[in-house]
Amino acid sequence: MTEVPWSAVPNGTDAAFLAGLGSLWGNSTIASTAAVSSSFRCALIKTGFQFYYLPAVYILVFIIGFLGNSVAIWMFVFHMKPWSGISVYMFNLALADFLYVLTLPALIFYYFNKTDWIFGDVMCKLQRFIFHVNLYGSILFLTCISAHRYSGVVYPLKSLGRLKKKNAIYVSVLVWLIVVVAISPILFYSGTGIRKNKTVTCYDSTSDEYLRSYFIYSMCTTVAMFCIPLVLILGCYGLIVRALIYKDLDNSPLRRKSIYLVIIVLTVFAVSYIPFHVMKTMNLRARLDFQTPEMCDFNDRVYATYQVTRGLASLNSCVDPILYFLAGDTFRRRLSRATRKASRRSEANLQSKSEEMTLNILSEFKQNGDTSL
């Protein structure tokens, strides 16, 4: 096990208040409590599983996410034209996932290297920035996909004009702008720090110096870019399910794709997004307000659970390609057609090379004067 002190920075306001009460009332207990709370910080115990669990998850996400999203982008660019509105959102979702998985090799090395960051402060900031851009970009694009499907199912005629590709492009540009602006403070809060053992940490949140303001920022982004989209998605899906029950859509492609969409997106939120945001908030609160000797074991458990949810939060990059395959507009059919075409082309090339090789062999025999063939 490795001890990594969070900090020895006092919780200034609370400590000063307690110290003032102790001085005013002459109460040594309160004064000593103030002294403890102003100086004591739990030593964070990093157990061995964190050095193996996270890199194992990230390796899995990198392999599956890289292959799945590469195929998805290839399909959208070369085989899905003309795009529908929902294809625009899915392409942007695949792009966000692909950019994130490209950053994982550095993170994998970081954890195999016992969390000693060797890539510099700028790369650390960029790593954390891209993670959060992917996280909240994915949530917002899933919200757009859900709203798009809701309009198509519940108001199929009224929504014809609103579901055009041009409008989806405008919305996608707006989503990217919102996410980049909202996440840009991460470039300030994140960064590297030197531990007592001279190794370098890459903060996944921030140092204790900026922890309280980061907590406020984190809560604002959680409410605006997670809670509100989740409520909108649940509302859309409730109305979609209601429409599927009351409308005559038995065995229609729209019904099937809508059901797949509901199941996959809710699974992603239940497994990846909800646990991560709950445990991230608890971990920040523990670092801020639960710094007493009797709370250190609790803080260690919170931190360990938070690390588990960090791995789960990255799994959406593996699951999203399943969404394109099952719930996308004609994605599965065109992927099958593209693979068959590529297979036929490969067979034709192989046959052509075989014929060329045979002709070359016959030519060599003739040149050598061998007429036995």
Curated annotation (Swiss-Prot):
Expressed in muscle, heart, liver, kidney, lung, brain, spleen, but not in testis. ADP binds at residues 46, 203-205, 283-287, 303-306, 310. Keywords: ATP-binding, Cell membrane, Disulfide bond, G-protein coupled receptor, Glycoprotein, Membrane, Nucleotide-binding, Receptor, Transducer, Transmembrane, Transmembrane helix. It is a multi-pass membrane protein. GO terms for cellular component: apical plasma membrane; basolateral plasma membrane; cell body; cilium; dendrite; glutamatergic synapse; plasma membrane; postsynaptic density. The chain crosses the membrane at residues 52-74, 88-109, 126-147, 167-188, 215-237, 261-284, 304-325. It is found in: Cell membrane. Its main location: membrane. Residues 1-51, 110-125, 189-214, 285-303 are extracellular. Glycans are attached at residues 11, 27, 113, 197. Disulfide bonds join 42-296, 124-202. One of its GO terms (molecular function) is ADP binding. It holds the Pfam family 7tm_1. InterPro entries: GPCR_Rhodpsn (IPR000276), GPCR_Rhodpsn_7TM (IPR017452), P2Y1_rcpt (IPR000142). Residues 75-87, 148-166, 238-260, 326-373 are cytoplasmic. GO terms for biological process: adenylate cyclase-inhibiting G protein-coupled receptor signaling pathway; blood vessel diameter maintenance; cellular response to purine-containing compound; eating behavior; establishment of localization in cell; G protein-coupled adenosine receptor signaling pathway; G protein-coupled purinergic nucleotide receptor signaling pathway; G protein-coupled receptor signaling pathway. Gene3D superfamilies: Rhodopsin 7-helix transmembrane proteins. It comes from the Eukaryota. Belongs to the G-protein coupled receptor 1 family. Receptor for extracellular adenine nucleotides such as ADP. In platelets, binding to ADP leads to mobilization of intracellular calcium ions via activation of phospholipase C, a change in platelet shape, and ultimately platelet aggregation. This is P2Y purinoceptor 1. It comes from Rattus norvegicus.
